[in-house]
Structures are given as structure tokens and as C-alpha cells.
Amino acid sequence: MPHGAEREASPAEESAGTRPLTGEEYLESLRDAREVYLDGSRVKDVTAHPAFHNPARMTARLYDSLHDPAQKAVLTAPTDAGDGFTHRFFTAPRSVDDLVKDQAAIASWARKSYGWMGRSPDYKASFLGTLGANADFYEPFADNARRWYRESQEKVLYWNHAFLHPPVDRSLPADEVGDVFIHVERETDAGLVVSGAKVVATGSALTHAAFISHWGLPIKDRKFALVATVPMDADGLKVICRPSYSANAATTGSPFDNPLSSRLDENDAILVLDQVLIPWENVFVYGNLGKVHLLAGQSGMIERATFHGCTRLAVKLEFIAGLLAKALDITGAKDFRGVQTRLGEVLAWRNLFWSLSDAAARNPVPWKNGTLLPNPQAGMAYRWFMQIGYPRVLEIVQQDVASGLMYVNSSTEDFRNPETGPYLEKYLRGSDGAGAVERVKVMKLLWDAVGSDFGGRHELYERNYSGNHENTRIELLLSQTASGKLDSYMDFAQACMDEYDLDGWTAPDLESFHAMRSASRDLLGGL
């Protein structure tokens, strides 16, 4: 278990079984020796720094909800590796009902961030929740898989992942960029000494551990064949963050001016491993060139991650649809027919992603040891549709709200200034008696969602996090080719073609009307 996530159970807790961390325990677990760097300095305490304080509290809300009697029925289930309770998605589903309840738990947590936390703790449960049923895949490290399945359930541990190699030269295989890509430098009795870098470690500063793996083109050198987890406070692990939207909001704005970015920034980072010792008990795959390439296809992680992502995006689109409707209302544009058609389109995208999430839950495929996976075809359809659907929704917002997104004052202080406040109340008011503050509040929230640095980052995320725009299409083709479905579609088309030829219908119950056509030709030939 990551050092920072340890806690002692009281006698009452021990008799009652294990339980997830509370929000305060989660925050305390982050106060360790992790090396997080931002703006040229090491962050001493991520729970107190303006870049991470509010995002950490938004995550703490999730942990606290697991202990709320009013929410436990939706969010939690008994652990299947012990005698406590956990977030439902950390367990392996064995029925359609389990998956439908998993969907509800994912959606419930997503609503607490209005759909804007793509990497909440349950996201990596897409992997952790497979480790019990699929432990044998990780031989000779199967016991590690079973232990992490149990421990992640018991505490609802928060993992990030970093699979991608730094794109220093995408034309070269990993073996030829060995000084950059994660690789094992040496083996010791205590574990593997590892160096290199991984991207993009979204939200990693506020997690308990990093999950690293080779991902991409085949490799030839076993030192790159590594799948493992690293505690965030491991010696030699460094987190180098991108600019913080939360810190910028705290410095130059306010919650009113930056209502999303000031509390929901999942900071993306570079993970640097400099001679990091990874204990053997934290290794899942090492040195097996074949197995490391099978991880995506045989771990069950992709099917579960797309199920989680599709459900979260459906929630997010409900938020955007509601906010867009408020913006159209407050600008007096809601009754224009063209505007109504495009709001209807946004609702159609919302319905599409909920339908794909429902299809994934209600049409699962059998998997290992009596467990089920969400339907992979629904998941692959989601991965493609999100790449065109989310940008289209943003385009509609920009098209129909238009300059209203920029027709705002710079700061809340403008309303308090007696020289500008009265003018703003007069010239920035909304329709149907809405005051200027109400109108600007809507527009600033919408701008943060679609036009700010935070909003732009989210568009990039939704477009790319589940695969590049070509792979999502190719993988659909390869999947349906391998399963024989594409052949069956071709056979279906051929069945139609087999019912006719140059001489007419070959089906005995259909009439080709040869005599009628012959008479018609004779008639036309006489003209």
C-alpha cells in the first residue's frame, strides 16, 4: 500500500471490517514526501497549495460520500476480498444487475464534479477491479495482482496512470530512445531499479500511486517490458506539472470568475523516474515481451475504462446542455427555431452517450472466473463518437451564444466599484428581468467550460484520451474483422445479391416479368 494511505483502524472498525478512507484521511494521505514541482519550485504540501487545495477538496467530497448513509446504497458494495465495503466499481461484476449498479455509482460520483473529473479515483478501478478475476494473467506476479485487488478495494486507493512515452521522436521505437523511455536499469533482491519518463500523468499530484506500463509499438528489449505501480512518495519519483488553472484563478480571479477551473483542474504532469526502486511486490509484468503487449487486449481495463468514460461524459453533457439552455434563456435567444434545433442536437448527443453506456452495462460479455465485462463494441463506438460529438457540442455553444461569452466584465470587483457597477447593472443585464450579476454568472461559467484554458484542455482531453482519431476507427474495424462480424455483414449483402442475376430473379417466389419487359421493348422499338 502507498505509504501515505496507511492508517490504523480502531477496535470498532476492525470488528466491523475494512472501510474506504474518509475525505480527511484522504487529504492526510497526501501529506508525505512526494516531489511535486510547479513554477520552478517544489510544492511542500499539495493539500495547501493554491494549485491543488480545491481539487483535493473536491476529491475529498467523493471519499466522504462513501460514508454518507443517504448515498451508500448507490455508491457502495461489500468487498469481495474481505469483510468491509467499497466503491462498487472496485469490485468485479458477475451479473447485469451488478453492472447497472456500477453505472449508477459512476454517474453519482461524476455528478459531484458536474462531469469534469475524468480521472476520479474510480477511473483507475477500471484496472484495479480486474485484478482478482484476472490474476493468473500476471504470473509469476499473480499474488501481487490479488493483493492489490484486495487493498485497493479496502481503502478505495486513488491511482493515476501514465502509459505514453514522451514524444521526443515518434518515428523511433522505444528501444532506440532508451535514455528517455521507462526502462529497468538493474535487478536487485529488493526489486527493480527503474529510470525514464512517462506522460501524461493526469491528476497524479493528488493520487496515492502511479500505474506505469509500456504502451504502443512492439519492443525487442526486455528492459522496456514493465507493468508496475509506484507510490507517489517513492524516492526518485518526480512530478513536473503543467501550468495550474487553479493557481491562476486564485491569483488573478475568483470563484465567480473561474467557477470550474478554480476547483476541478486535474493537473497533467510528466512523471520522471530517476533510479526508482520498485519492490517486486509492486510488479505485474516484467521482461515478458509478449505479455506486455497483451495488456490492453487481455486485462479487461479498456472495456471498463470506456464504460466509465462514457457514463461520465453523459453526465457532463447534461451539465453543458442545462448551462447552454440557461444562457439561451438569459440572452433572449431560446425561442429562435434554429437555436432550438441545435439545443436539441446537444440533447441528442447526451442521449447517445447514455444509450451507449446502457448498452455496455446491459449487454456484457463473459470474462474470467464468472465475471463480466461491459460490452466492448459499445465502448469502441463511444470512443469514436466522443471525438466528433464533444467538439460539435462546443461548436454549438460558440455559435449560438457567440459574443455573449465575451460580453462580460473582467472581475467581480467591477460590480463593487461605484464608478462601473451602475453601468454594468444597466448594460449587462439579461432578458426577462435577469440582473447583470445573474447574466454574467452564467456566461463566466459557460466560458470556463468551453473557452478558457481549462475548457480548451477538456476539449483536447475528450478528443484524445481514449486513443488517437485514427486508432479508434481502425480498432473498430479490426475487432469486427477478428470476430467474423464483418464477414457476416458481407454475407448478408451477398444474400441479397444472390437473389438476382442478369436473367432476373433467382428466388422462386419473385416474378421477373420477362414478357412484360419484352413487350415494352418492342413497343419502344417501333417508335
UniProtKB/Swiss-Prot annotation:
Lineage: superkingdom: Bacteria
Keyword set includes Flavoprotein: yes
Residue stretches of biased makeup (Basic and acidic residues): 1-10
UniProt keyword terms in alphabetical order: Antibiotic biosynthesis, FAD, Flavoprotein, Monooxygenase, Oxidoreductase
Catalytic function, reaction form: (3S)-3-amino-3-(3-chloro-4-hydroxyphenyl)propanoyl-[SgcC2 peptidyl-carrier protein] + FADH2 + O2 = (3S)-3-amino-3-(3-chloro-4,5-dihydroxyphenyl)propanoyl-[SgcC2 peptidyl-carrier protein] + FAD + H2O + H(+)
Presence of keyword Ribosomal protein: no
Pfam families per record: HpaB, HpaB_N
Chain segments carrying region Disordered: 1-22
Residues holding FAD: 161-163, 167-170, 202
Control of this protein's activity: The SgcE6-SgcC hydroxylation activity decreases in the presence of excess FAD.
Known EC number: 1.14.14.15
GO biological process terms held by the UniProt record: antibiotic biosynthetic process
UniProt xrefs under Gene3D superfamilies: 4-hydroxybutyryl-coa dehydratase, domain 1, Butyryl-CoA Dehydrogenase, subunit A, domain 2, Butyryl-CoA Dehydrogenase, subunit A, domain 3
Pathway note: Antibiotic biosynthesis
Subunit structure: Homotetramer.
Family, similarity comment: Belongs to the FADH(2)-utilizing monooxygenase family.
Name of the featured protein: (3S)-3-amino-3-(3-chloro-4-hydroxyphenyl)propanoyl-[peptidyl-carrier protein SgcC2] monooxygenase
Organism: Streptomyces globisporus
Organism ancestry: Bacteria, Bacillati, Actinomycetota, Actinomycetes, Kitasatosporales
